[in-house]
Amino acid sequence: MQSLLDGHHHQLPSLLQQHHNGHHLLDQHQQHQHQLPPQATTTSESDGRAPRDELEMSKSGGSDNLESGGGGGGGGSGGDQDPNQRPRKKRYHRHTQHQIQELEAFFKECPHPDDKQRKELSRELGLEPLQVKFWFQNKRTQMKTQHERHENNALRAENEKLRAENMRYKEALANASCPNCGGPAAIGEMSFDEHHLRLENARLRDEIDRISAIAAKYVGKPAAAVSAAYPPLPPSNRSPLDHMGIPGAGADVFGADFDKPLVIELAVAAMEELVRMAQLGEPLWAPALGGEALGEEEYARTFPRGLGPKSPELRSEASRETAVVIMNHVSLVEMLMDVGQWTALFSSIVSRAATLEVLSTGVAGNHNGALQLMSAEFQMPSPLVPTRETQFLRYCKQHPDGTWAVVDVSLDGLRAGAGGGCQPAAARGHRRRPSGCLIQEMPNGYSKVTWVEHVEADDQMVHNLYKPVVNSGMAFGARRWVATLERQCERLASAMASNVASSGDAGVITTSEGRRSMLKLAERMVASFCGGVTASTTHQWTTLSGSGAEDVRVMTRKSVDDPGRPPGIILNAATSFWLPVPPSRVFDFLRDDSTRSEWDILSNGGVVQEMAHIANGRDHGNAVSLLRVNNANSNQSNMLILQECCTDATGSYVIYAPVDVVAMNVVLNGGDPDYVALLPSGFAILPDGPDGGGGSLLTVAFQILVDSVPTAKLSLGSVATVNSLIACTVERIKAAITGDNGVAPPCPR
């Protein structure tokens, strides 16, 4: 032992000096996780040999195991040694990987083991109890040092951030000027926060004036007159991102050729316009048939620094609607800002949508300040109304009173030359002026939604049969958006209900999982039907025939590797026509099981029995059903029909699809509905005008698998059969609803 001390006596003073200077051996070997304790701690718990033992062990990295030939063990206290036993020369070796892993695992569970636990560990690992004790002491010291270093770094960064913010405030105060007279601001007459807000408001007004002129220049229109009431302020080093409250939005996600500050300021101006459009009354909005009408002259006076004059080539549509929906404000904002959820929520209006670029994700934990570039295609459930395709910014902001606002605004030509390739509004036929909604929190999980739709669109391709509906705002206006939102919120509330109806109307549905799976399958069926009716580009349909008002549009597509559709060649046939009866009467007739055999070839004259029923809202017409057709010519039937009926003030739907019995049993047991093949058919029923008291516009659409081989060639006979089927169905419906006693033609089998 003396020889060991002699060999290293020159190291001991320097190490002790380091200890007195406040340094720890741990700082020299921070990369090692298994060091022995500091000298002071060791000395207090041993007889003086422990510090020298630790010195020797620290030379080898702190993971050495000290062993002795004596019974006391190396590094132990003098009281643990047998005085009659002849001491033997101690030897060292590193802790094994197994020992280190076991010690680390135990430390995670218990960083302060008692004497009994240390002895148990020593027996299991072949170490001395004092070695185990020293290891835990060192480990705790190391963890404490790392934690303190991390805290110090965080506090230092926070301190620097506060210093920088304080410096910015001082500079702003030094350069502050009155927004009205341009002289020094009288800070003493107002609070600091009020002064800061006034300064920000004045600067934002100036920026909005500037962006209005630039935006008008980009779209080739003369700039609006800039109001002289807000003189320009001195230039600021703050980015427009700061004015929007967008954190961490410095990444160049729009490309080098794109004026990103211009886009951000466009979003700010759109948000201000939306809020005022939603809150102002007369004379900006005047009462009109079926809602409110926008006063164009008052709009031009109210927003002189808006997005430029309206295009004479496009027709202006403006509408506003308010409703209270059964969804909390946080969930509603989340669904509007997630493109997938937004598309599913408004599947009858939005045939496709995508997020092209994200400029900001907003504040962590919510979407306050989120800004993204999106594209979407809006649709009407008729082949006689072309879809509207557009690219727009979507900006979300929470206002000081707690109200959330989500605004859309078209980019028009501002993105020309960049990767997105936006075209002018006139070329696309659709321009989205500031549109969106204000969302206010209400008690009991409800939200008050005020929706504003303000667009310019080319309606030249709209058929005369549907122009009254389109021009009244029933097709793409705020009333339809809000009515759809109300109905879908009730549907989601029904889907999330955990209880299964006990009154017997649930039928074969016995679990909440089966209920949710069936609703999810019906949701996909409705989305597929709506997209197919309008020949949306999402579903890759190709028109083969159809030009007149009641002509049948026949479209085809090949289904390959799509678990939601059967493989092969699928034909879709759709037509729209007018009926001289109210929409409610048409809806009740088509969803009535007792009259289904009068028009449905699938029933084939059999009796239709409802096997399951799920109510989807307050209106008894909103429901999902599972039907079974009992054919009189057979003892049992394998034909099941999934059907969803939905109705609101702007339209109604009866959509159905035959489903396989085995696949449906899986769904009813809570299985995945995405792998159930569906080909939906059905009806879309719209009022023929804004008052809703006249006739109905009915669209009939079928999807039929004509060949199970995707590579097969489409035969003219298949097209003729589908044409005959839809023509026969139309004639039968007309005869049944209008009371025509004429004999309807037989439908093809």
Swiss-Prot record:
InterPro entries recorded: GLABRA2/ANL2/PDF2/ATML1-like, HD, Homeobox_CS, Homeodomain-like_sf, START-like_dom_sf, START_lipid-bd_dom
UniProt-recorded Gene Ontology molecular function terms: DNA binding; DNA-binding transcription factor activity, RNA polymerase II-specific; lipid binding
Gly residues: bias regions: 68-79
UniProt feature, compositional bias: Basic residues: 86-97
Domain START: 256-494
Entries under Pfam families matching the protein: Homeodomain (PF00046), START (PF01852)
Superkingdom, taxonomy of origin: Eukaryota
Annotated localization: Nucleus
Region (Disordered) location: 26-98
Keywords: Coiled coil, DNA-binding, Homeobox, Nucleus, Transcription, Transcription regulation
GO cellular component annotations of the record: nucleus
Residue runs in coiled coils: 137-218
Portion annotated as DNA-binding: 88-147
Bias (Basic and acidic residues): 46-57
PANTHER family: HOMEOBOX-LEUCINE ZIPPER PROTEIN MERISTEM L1, HOMEOBOX-LEUCINE ZIPPER PROTEIN ROC7
Function per UniProt: Probable transcription factor.
Record family assignment: Belongs to the HD-ZIP homeobox family. Class IV subfamily.
Protein name: Homeobox-leucine zipper protein ROC7
Species: Oryza sativa subsp. japonica (Rice)
Gene that encodes it: ROC7
